[in-house]
Design a protein with these regions (language model features):
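Exposed beta-sheet edge and beta->alpha loop/turn motif
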Residues: 5, 115-165
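Charge-rich, low-complexity terminal tails
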Residues: 19-23, 28, 113, 123-128
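Short, low-complexity N-terminal intrinsically disordered segments enriched in polar/charged residues
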Residues: 4, 10-14, 20-70, 78
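Polar/charged side chains located within well-ordered beta-strands of beta-rich proteins
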Residues: 61-64, 92, 99, 103, ...
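Mature, folded catalytic cores of secreted/periplasmic enzymes
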Residues: 70, 74-75, 94, 130-132, ...
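Short solvent-exposed beta->alpha transition segments
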Residues: 59, 73-121
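Amphipathic coiled-coil/heptad-repeat helices and related helical stalk/stem segments
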Residues: 53, 60, 88-89, 138
């Protein structure tokens, strides 16, 4: 009786290990991840309840990334909430002196949209055109936009899921 129970326990354990092993290889396959390709007309996706507001936030994000690519700290700061502009401009001046990067928006998905705020998940590609220690990558960025007196502005950005190229 004990032998039979021991045999079943070993078989069940082996099946569990084999299943975990199979699941691991199934989820970490060697296929390359698929990334959206940049285009002139980027398609907005997600929970869009106000098309005009979503388009305004998309325009702000494009301006933000273009200003970063152009190393224009003033234009970059203009896309941020008023409270963050002065400090960010000073920090960017030092960063722009060391690195020249090109930023490309690959996708724009509205996660949550309210009258005065919007959460957007965007896929962004950042590359260094010159030989530098900066690592080219694609990242998912969660941008929180808020509506201020002068329009939609970026309040916060959280970067996640960075894949180095």
């Amino acid at each position: 009786m004990k032998t039979s129970l021991l045999r079943r326990t070993i078989i069940v354990s082996l099946l569990a290990v084999v299943s975990l092993f199979f699941l691991y290889f199934l989820t970490t396959g060697s296929s390359a991840p698929v990334h959206a390709q940049p285009s002139e007309k980027l398609e907005m996706t997600g929970n869009i309840t106000n098309q005009a507001a979503a388009e305004a936030c998309l325009a702000v994000l494009k301006e933000n990334l273009q200003a970063a690519s152009d190393q224009d700290a003033t234009a970059y700061a203009a896309t941020l909430v008023a409270a963050a502009r002065a400090e960010t401009t000073q920090e960017l001046a030092a960063f722009f002196a060391e690195e020249q990067l090109q930023h490309t928006l690959l996708s724009f998905e509205v996660v949550k949209q309210e009258t005065e705020s919007m959460l957007v998940a965007a896929q962004q590609k950042t590359i260094s055109p010159k030989d530098s220690s900066y690592r080219d990558h694609i990242t998912e960025a969660y941008h929180t936009f808020v509506k201020e007196a002068d329009g939609w502005k970026i309040q916060e950005t959280v970067m996640t899921n960075t894949e180095f190229l």
